Regions:
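Radical SAM enzyme [4Fe-4S]-AdoMet core and its adjacent flexible, acidic
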Residues: 1-60, 64-74
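Flexible mid-to-C-terminal extensions adjoining Fe-S/redox cofactors in radical SAM and related proteins
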Residues: 58-59, 64-131
Length: 131
């Protein structure tokens, strides 16, 4: 529920008594609802500069993708081969490159938000069909 998320971001931004850490998946909400210096924000790097490797040696573009079929098996092939040739990584990058957000003035901060879970994107543009 975006109203609850908005209320959360506003409450946290007004509270100076505690420190709250955010996952990079929260960047669209932070940019939209909080007064934060953009140079202090690090956006999602999934399939751009990072990957998640599970304890069973499956490599995913993002840790949120664990327990899906979007992985490469490091027991069967190399990290480089998965990174460059896996359908999961190729499809993830294609969605990033085709994002409607690329022309947005905030794109350099959030990189278009979350490809895998668009419901967590809290951008003011509110593209319901973002991906």
């Amino acid at each position: 529920d975006s109203d609850k998320l908005k209320a959360f971001y506003l409450a946290v931004s007004n509270c100076k008594c505690v420190k709250v850490g955010f996952d990079s998946c929260c960047v669209p909400g932070i940019v939209t609802w909080m007064d934060v210096n953009p140079t202090l924000i690090e956006s999602c790097e999934s399939a751009r500069f990072s990957a998640f490797i599970s304890e069973d040696m499956k490599m995913y573009p993002c840790s949120f993708m664990a327990n899906t079929n979007l992985w490469g098996d490091l027991r069967a092939t190399s990290l480089l081969n998965i990174w460059q040739n896996s359908p999961a990584f190729k499809n993830h990058r294609a969605k990033i490159l085709n994002s409607k957000c690329r022309g947005c003035k905030h794109y350099h901060i959030c990189n278009g938000g979350c490809v895998f879970m668009p419901e967590i994107n809290q951008c003011k543009n509110n593209y319901s069909d973002l991906w």
